[in-house]
Swiss-Prot record:
GO terms for biological process: Rho protein signal transduction. One of its GO terms (cellular component) is cytosol. Residues 1-22 are annotated as: Disordered. It comes from Caenorhabditis elegans. The gene is rhi-1. Keywords: Cytoplasm, GTPase activation. This is Probable rho GDP-dissociation inhibitor. It is found in: Cytoplasm. Belongs to the Rho GDI family. Its main location: cytoplasm. It holds the Pfam family Rho_GDI. One of its GO terms (molecular function) is GTPase activator activity. InterPro entries: Ig_E-set (IPR014756), Rho_GDI (IPR000406), RhoGDI_dom_sf (IPR024792).
C-alpha cells in the first residue's frame, strides 16, 4: 500500500479489522520473563506513560506545519492552539511547477497512536479538485517532538491552474480520533 492514496473511491474488497488497542502498561507487562524482549520494549515504548501537556487530553498534539519548497522551508505555521485556527487566514503561495511537501511537528502522549493520517480536500471555486490521504504512521509517546514529512508533490502549472485554492486539512488516526482540523488557502502563482 502506498503512503498516500486518493480517497475518491474505496476499491478494497477486504475489510481490515484492527486489533484491539492495548495500553503501554499492558504491552510492557506482557512477556515479563523474556529479558531481551523486556529491554527491546522499554527502548521502543519507554518506561511508561508520557504526558507532555496535562491539560490536553489528546494523544497527538500537533505543534506546527512547514511548507518545504524545493527542500527549503518557505513558510511555517503554529498549529498548537486549535482555537486560534478557527478564524485565522493561513495563506501560502507556491510558484507553479515547484516541488513541495509538508512537514508536521507533533507530540504523542499518554498512549500509542496507531495509523495517524493527514487528509486534505482541495477546492477551487467550490469544486473539489483533489482529495488525498497520507499515512503518517504509528507512534509511541515521547517527550521529544516527532516529525512527519509528506511525499514530494509538484504544484500544477499553466494558466488554467494558477489561482486560489481552499484546502481543508485534518489529522486523524485509525480510531477516527480527530487531532486537528483546519483550513488554509493555497495560491499557485506564475512567479
Amino acid at each position: 500500500m502506498s503512503d498516500h492514496e486518493n480517497t475518491g473511491e474505496n476499491t478494497s474488497e477486504y475489510q481490515y479489522k484492527q486489533p484491539p488497542q492495548k495500553s503501554i502498561d499492558e504491552l510492557l507487562n506482557a512477556d515479563k520473563e523474556d529479558e531481551s524482549l523486556k529491554v527491546y520494549k522499554a527502548k521502543l515504548l519507554g518506561q511508561g506513560t508520557v504526558i507532555v501537556d496535562e491539560k490536553n487530553p489528546l494523544r497527538v498534539i500537533v505543534r506546527s506545519v512547514e511548507l518545504l519548497i524545493n527542500g527549503k522551508t518557505a513558510q511555517s505555521f503554529d498549529l498548537s492552539d486549535p482555537a486560534k485556527l478557527v478564524n485565522s487566514d493561513l495563506s501560502v503561495s507556491i510558484k507553479e511547477g515547484s516541488n513541495y511537501r509538508l512537514s508536521f511537528a507533533f507530540h504523542v502522549q499518554r498512549e500509542i497512536t496507531s495509523g495517524l493520517h493527514y487528509k486534505h480536500k482541495v477546492k477551487r471555486s467550490g469544486i473539489t479538485v483533489e482529495n488525498e490521504k497520507y499515512m503518517m504512521g504509528s507512534y509511541a509517546p515521547k517527550l521529544e517532538i516527532q516529525e512527519y514529512k509528506s511525499p514530494n508533490e509538484e504544484a500544477p502549472s499553466g494558466m488554467m491552474h494558477r489561482g486560489k485554492y481552499k484546502v481543508y486539512s485534518k489529522i486523524t488516526d485509525d480510531d477516527n480520533n480527530v487531532y486537528l482540523d483546519w483550513q488554509w488557502t493555497l495560491h499557485i502563482t506564475k512567479e
